[in-house]
Every structure is written in structure tokens, then in C-alpha cells.
Amino acid sequence: MIKNIIKYVGISLFVVFFISACAKKTLNIISKDSLYEKGLEYTLINDIVYKNDTKAIMNITYLNASEPNEYDYKYHEFLIGIYIDDINEGLQNKQYILSMNSNTKYIQIPLKKDHPLYNHIPVKNPYAIYYIIKFKKGLEKTLSLKLSHKKFGNANIIYKRF
């Protein structure tokens, strides 16, 4: 009887020790990169599919929402990855048009691999070309970003204004 109690206490202590050690390691892994965490919350992905073939993929992180004190109050700023099937020219491909609430005027900054944000991209497509895109702020309550192609259709992503 006493041997059984000692055995159960020993097993219980081992399990408690094992679980507590795992929890600390797991928390350290999860909370290492706060830029990644914040960015992941405001990252959305959509694609253009035509006849069961993916023609383009865009993943967008709304930077103003993820880091409100870091970004320009005059612009809505986005980290955008664009992958276009066949010849991946990103936004240089004139067959695809990027817009926000029908506005096609924006500032485009190519994101190079040595840029500080590059290593914190929440959902990284290795085939995409990345940009920081700035649209001038207006009175809009929602931000509807659209990548469109005349033949293949549209990919839409909608954010609430921050």
C-alpha cells in the first residue's frame, strides 16, 4: 500500500516537473518575435484562381494596425507580397492592378532582404515579391484592397480602418 502511494507520488512529481519545463520552453519560442506576432494578427491572404489554376497570390499585412506608433499618420501602410504565376514580375506586371477603395495611386517601396521588416514577415511566400505600399488616408471606414486582372478576376482583402 505504501509502495503504491510512493509510486503515484513519484509519477505525479515527474509529470508536474515535465509539464512545467515544457511550458517554459514553449512560451519562449512563441514570444520571441513581437513584430511577427503583431503582424500575424493583421495579415490576410487571397488569390486569383482561373479555371482551377492559381494565377496570383497576395498576402497583406496592415502595418498601421500592427505598429500604430511606427507608421505615418497621413498614409495607410501595408506590407504586400505579390506572386504572379508564369512571369513573376510582382506589381511591375501591368496586367495586374492594385487598388484600395478604387484608388490606384500609391507609393511603392520594394522590400529588399536586408530591410528590417523582411525577417519579420508573418506569412512569407518564397516566390512572392514584397513591397511597402502607402495609400493616402481619406475618410474611408473600411480599406478594400484589390488585385485585379481583366481576364482572371480579382482578389479582395478588407480591413477596418485603424
Model features per residue range: what roles?
Residues M1-C22:
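Sec-dependent bacterial lipoprotein signal peptides
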Residues C22-F162:
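Conserved functional micro-motifs across diverse proteins
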